[in-house]
């Protein structure tokens, strides 16, 4: 169930850990996923004041051998398109758009999902991937309201052609108290 009217391009870049990369490969999406991903050579944490390195992790052949797939960066819209196309190709999956889940009533052997139009459906399992204002989270003990942590992250996507000569590193600059 998706609240929006269709698959939308929201967000910028997504960093895919080896665990998630292995999952994409196991779902048969490895070739398409590999085409859109950029594999950084290392992850570097730097001090914001002087750009000195706090820590660097090489993502070399040893890392890939240990984890079976590399760490990868992808454009979110391209990843969503690959997954959306794979789901749409399945005959045993139905995507329902413009469907607003307002509550979930957990039960012993099934749960009832309530929708904004007053309808409901019963399921053996409910998986919530419904974001920061989750309707599903309170059903599994996540009762804390979201709050600002005081931290912010900024990302940008730059055309590959504009940065081809730069090292492919993930760099984090750590500011005060972080």
Regions found by a protein language model. Name each.
Residues 76-78, 85, 133-175:
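Central beta-strand plus flanking loop segment that forms part of the substrate or channel wall
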Residues 50, 107, 117, 130, ...:
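Acidic/polar residues in short coil/turn loops that connect beta-strands
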Residues 1-12:
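Glycine-rich FAD pyrophosphate-binding loop
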Residues 97-111:
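A conserved short coil-to-beta-strand element within the FAD-binding core of flavoproteins
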Residues 93-94:
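Short, conserved active-site loop motifs that form the nucleotide-linked donor/cofactor pocket
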Residues 1, 79, 101, 121-132:
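Short hydrophobic core segments
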Residues 12-88:
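Active-site-adjacent segment of FAD-dependent monooxygenases/related oxidoreductases
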């Amino acid at each position: 169930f998706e609240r929006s009217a269709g698959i939308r391009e929201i967000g910028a870049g997504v960093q895919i850990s080896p665990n998630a990369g292995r999952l994409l490969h196991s779902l048969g999406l490895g070739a398409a996923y590999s085409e859109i991903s950029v594999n950084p050579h290392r992850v570097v944490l730097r001090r914001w004041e002087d750009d000195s390195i706090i820590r660097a992790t090489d993502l070399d052949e040893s890392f890939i051998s240990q984890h079976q797939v590399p760490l990868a960066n992808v454009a979110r819209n391209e990843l969503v398109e690959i997954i959306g196309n794979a789901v749409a190709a399945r005959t045993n999956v139905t995507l329902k758009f413009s469907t607003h889940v307002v509550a979930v009533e957990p039960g012993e052997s099934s749960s009832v999902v309530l929708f904004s139009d007053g309808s409901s459906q019963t399921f053996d399992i409910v998986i919530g991937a419904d974001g920061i204002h989750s309707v599903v989270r309170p059903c599994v003990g996540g009762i804390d309201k979201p709050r600002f942590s005081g931290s912010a992250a900024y990302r940008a996507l730059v055309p590959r052609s504009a940065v081809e000569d730069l090292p492919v590193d993930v760099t984090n600059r750590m500011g005060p108290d972080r």
